Amino acid sequence: MRSVSFASAVALCLCLAPEMLAQGGGGRWRRPEEITNRTGAFFTDIAGPTADGDKVADLATLELARTAKSANQMVVLYLVDGGDDQDTREQFESTLFANDELGIELKFFHCARIDLAKEPALKTKYTKQAPLFVVFDASGKPVELSMSGYKPQTSALSKLLEKQAAGTVKPSLAGFAKTYGGIIQDLEQVLSKKKQALQKQAKAGGDQGKRAEADKDVKALEAEEQKILTKEKDLLSKVRLPERDAKAQRVGAPRWGGRGGAPGGGDAGGGRGAGGGTGSGGGTPAGGTNGG
């Protein structure tokens, strides 16, 4: 995982301080959609495999798993019981998926969530292991990671993704996540500074001196933003990311204005973006995280 120096962390906090205050203080702040679309964990809700009474087919028989295997692509299945306590689930997901680099690594996988509360036979089989992650490599070989008791294991999940991606993502999934994470961090800082500059520009009114200064700052920050986006585009052009399903939802997002439904709700995912844009209307740049 990418480590951030103390100086960088302080600089980022200073840049984002006004936004944190705008959200009511307490250290809570809403990250721009341009950032969460790049770093969030997006999953598509799907039904489990066919069941005959208390017997259920193997997870590898899912259409998503079979289609991904035929395309030499990877899959992450998230099995969770939507009947469990919602606060516990949401805290688990919020903690587990708070790491940007994990969200970046998930971009290389088709990600789907199965609600065990709606799958009696599957629940009987996996209830002791859930929440459970099943990660299929490009050849269709699955490896399971149980987080029973809702104990988040971010590092363990990341290492499993990296293991299953070995040989498929080159030179390495961890290396890509570290590089892309740095680009996104730079972009987030510039977007924050640009937002503040635009606010100063709006408040300048008829003061020509203040407006000229604000205009200069905005122009410089927009130029810096474009440099970062070009760097991002160059990096993404070297990899192939699976399409994000239009029904994908962000899992682990903070609840700002209410609670979602079982098993977790979340922000809408959106489709594949054009690559490099930071507008809030599009999807994730140059590919997404989810199949379905």
Where does each model-flagged region fall?
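Local sequence-structure signature of Cys/Sec-based thiol-disulfide redox active-site neighborhoods
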Residues: 26-103
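Charged, low-complexity interaction regions
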Residues: 202-213
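Amphipathic alpha-helical coiled-coil segments
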Residues: 217-247
